[in-house]
Amino acid sequence: MKRILLTLCLIGFLMTNLLSQENAIKVDSGYINVDGGKLFYEMAGRGDNIVLLHDGMLDREVWDNQFPLLAMNYRVVRYDRRTYGKSSDPLAPFSDIEDLNQIFIQLNIDKAIVFGMSAGGGLAIDFTLKYPGRVSALILVGAVVNGFYYSPHMMNRGGHLKNPADLSDPQKAIKYFAWDDPYEIYSENVSAKEKFVKILESSQHKSTGNFYIPADRPGANFLSEIKIPVLILVGEYDIPDVHAHSGVIQFGIPKSRREIILNSGHLIPLEQPEAFNRTVFNFLNRMFFNILYSQGMDAAIQYLNIKKAGNPDVKLFNEGEMNAWGYRFLQEGKIKDAVELFKLNVQAYPGSANAFDSLAEAYLKDGQKDMAIKNYEKSLELNPGNDNARKALTELKGGNR
C-alpha cells in the first residue's frame, strides 16, 4: 500500500519528467510476424500485463504520457496496428482481433488489462468477447462500440466540417482535426494539438482499402457477456456520439463505471495526462474491490491469493475501504461474505483494534458468539479505550451466566 500511495503522490512530478523516465526504463522493441504483415511493438516493465491500443487516427505514441509511468509497476506493451506507425500496410484481408491475439501469443501474455482508445476501445471490446480468458480488466477511453450507429452530427462534425472531401487530403485533414474541429482536442489544449500534428506528420494514416475484416458479431449486442472490471472514460468536450457510445457501453456491461475527464476533447491521454493517469491509477490500485464488485467474492479471493503467492506481504486494499465494504455486505444481508472481508482485514492489519472490533460484530450477526467474544477481546487488548468492545463483552459474557 505504501508503494501505491507513493506512486500516486509522484504522478505530478513524473509527468514533467516523462522523457527522462522513458530513457531510464528498458524498452524492448521489434516486430512480430502476423498473417500477411508485421506489427511493430514496444514493451517495458515487470509485473501484471497491460496492453495499450491506440485510436483510429494516431499510433502507439498517443500513449507517450502513460507508457513509461505504467512500466514502473506493470509489464506494458503498446504496438502499432496495421496501417499505423511502423507496422506494415495490409496486402490481403486481415483482422485486428487476430493481430492482437498474436501480440498476446508471441509476447507471452497470458492475460492482460487492456486499454482501448476510441476505435481501439471497440477493438478491446471485440477482443474481450472473442477471447474472454485473455482480458482481466478494460479501460475504455473515448471508446466507440461496433454495432451502434453514428449520427449525421458525427459525420459532419456538428456542421464544422464544411467539405468532407477535404479529409482525403492528409495535410488538410491534419489541419482540420488539430485546429478547427472542436471535439477532437479541446481548444485550450495547445500542446496536445502540437503533439497530434507531430505524430500524424511523421506517420500519416494509411487506408486499409477493402482488406479490413470486421468482428464476427457486433459488440454492442453482446456487451452483457463482459463480466470483468471496466472503467469508461470520456472527455467533457468530446463529440456527442462518443458520449452516446459510452452510455451504451456502460448500460451494456454489468457494473461498469464511467467518468468524465474535464477540459478534454477526444484524446484524453494527450490532453489531460495528469487527470487521466490519476484516474487510471486509482482504478488499478483498487483492483481487488473492482473484482469484488463486478465478479464477486470468489473471484476477488482468487485474485488476492494469486498476488499473495508472489508476495506474501502485499497489501491490496486500504483498511478503511475494506471495513466499509464489510459493513455494506452486512447491510445487504451478505453476512458470510462480510465475515470473510473482515477476516481479510485483520490478516492485513493485525495491529488494528477497529478491524478486530468489526470482525467481532460480523461474527455476532452470524451467530458465532464465541468468535465474537474472542475478537472483541483482541480489539480491547489492542485498544484498552475501546468502550464499544468492553460494552459488547459485558453483554455477551453476562449472557453466558
Feature locations, PLM:
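Conserved HGGG/HGGXW glycine-rich cap/lid loop of the alpha/beta-hydrolase fold
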Residues: 37-86
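Catalytic active-site module of serine/aspartate enzymes centered on a nucleophile-bearing elbow/loop
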Residues: 256-294
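Conserved alpha/beta-hydrolase catalytic His-Asp/Glu region
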Residues: 149-150, 168-224
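Short beta-strand/loop motif that positions the catalytic acidic residue
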Residues: 226, 232-234
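Flexible "cap/lid" loop of the alpha/beta hydrolase fold
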Residues: 129, 138-167
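Active-site loop/oxyanion-hole signature of alpha/beta-hydrolase fold enzymes
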Residues: 78-115, 119
